[in-house]
UniProtKB/Swiss-Prot annotation:
<dbReference type="InterPro" id="IPR012901">
    <property type="entry name" value="CARME"/>
</dbReference>
<dbReference type="InterPro" id="IPR016853">
    <property type="entry name" value="S-AdoMet-bd_YMR209C_prd"/>
</dbReference>
<feature type="transmembrane region" description="Helical">
    <location>
        <begin position="250"/>
        <end position="270"/>
    </location>
</feature>
<dbReference type="InterPro" id="IPR029063">
    <property type="entry name" value="SAM-dependent_MTases_sf"/>
</dbReference>
<keyword id="KW-0812">Transmembrane</keyword>
<keyword id="KW-1133">Transmembrane helix</keyword>
<dbReference type="Pfam" id="PF07942">
    <property type="entry name" value="CARME"/>
</dbReference>
<dbReference type="GO" id="GO:0016020">
    <property type="term" value="C:membrane"/>
</dbReference>
<keyword id="KW-0472">Membrane</keyword>
<protein>
    <recommendedName>
        <fullName>Uncharacterized protein YMR209C</fullName>
    </recommendedName>
</protein>
<dbReference type="GO" id="GO:0008757">
    <property type="term" value="F:S-adenosylmethionine-dependent methyltransferase activity"/>
</dbReference>
<feature type="transmembrane region" description="Helical">
    <location>
        <begin position="1"/>
        <end position="21"/>
    </location>
</feature>
Amino acid sequence: MVSSLASNIILALVVVLMTLLRQNKPLQRWFVSYVEKLLSRKSNLAQKVSVLSPSLKLVDVEKSISADQSNLSKINYQIPTLPDLTGNLIRLHEYRARGEGYNGLLFRRARQLNGISEDQLQKLGYFTKLMKNNEGIRENARVIDKIIEFTLGKLIHSNEHDEEFTEEIEKICAEHGYKIKDGHLIQLNPDFVFPIVSSRGSQSVVHEALAHLCRDFSSYYSVERDPLQNFIISRINHHVISAGDMKEKILIVTPGAGVGGLSHTLATTFPKIQVDSIELSALMYICNLFALEYKHDVKIRPFVQQYSCQTVFDNQLRSLSADLSKVGHRSNLDPLWGDFTRYSPISKDYDKIIICSAYFIDTAENMFEYLSSIEALKKYCKELHWVNVGPLKYGTKPLVQFTGDELSRLRKIRGWKDLVEEYEVDSSKGLNGYLTDYESMYQGYYGLLKFHSVFES
């Protein structure tokens, strides 16, 4: 009875408030402004919480940072914030709804055809194909659920002793259908389909991150990885490391690390050398941590939403295994999240630092900023090497677009000495695919620019 009375009173107050807001424009403007300020204040508070990598430990940037948080000094400023992390978790969680929504659009378009055409589509099994495609999307979504659950679990574990962030972390978990009990995640409704809550942001970056898990860790894509890794490893083995001498203090840095395949291979190949990998994309970085720590293989359907140039539907729907059981975290590997141009090592007494870049330099909006950031590492070592392999396919609104020859001459102007420079552009000898579907009617390949330079200025 009391509960019912209280509910009626609250309802009456809400009705009165809504009536006042409709009739009183100044009050309406004040109320909207007040709500916006509350939301803005909450957003600003979250913006002041930084995420340290690779632990995902949260820190208030306005408070002093304890000395044991050493990786903070590797990314000097513009450290990723909590909204950077949570916004991309939402992007991941929207994958199923957006994917099935697109298939629904294809279904509705086909239904616009006349009766004869629709009857022929039924005989072809076209609508059945779209339904089966939804099943493929759901299987990918289950992998994404594992990535989200892993990330939330890591966030909880790394901040379990920081009560100031407990409420915020509980809220983040609840948004994704979890609650925290005794320090562990419990899924509230496994069948819940996460709705589309953000109108901004493309799902192409989610598809790309999933596909990169295959490219970096599936045997299917070893044909793409091996030429890159073999060149880099060969240069380090034969032209950087002194024969039989591992007493030198050496650091390998891999900018634009993606989901971490190259950096993990280098850390495994050279277990006595520290490897720092840096990745700017939150989605790629989340998948990088997942790959290093999940310890189980996952099956991904990387072509499920690629309708063009397919020979048969089974090829579009086929799965690849990302062999994460063979990965495992390496003690000499530090995967960092942030802008490479804000990176600097902790130690200043390295004998050699080796920049290992693959499919990286053409991502620069400002090539000179990339070059300056690489050259700035010279003050941390006696000898600075740069081993690069990849095309020059410019994107991201570049300020300059150099030819290979111009880039070579620019290196010389800036004080680099090339130990080797070569091109692979002969299609008869094999070019390099990049997330290529080798069963498709469209297969893209790149020529490669390979160089190994030493900075002498």
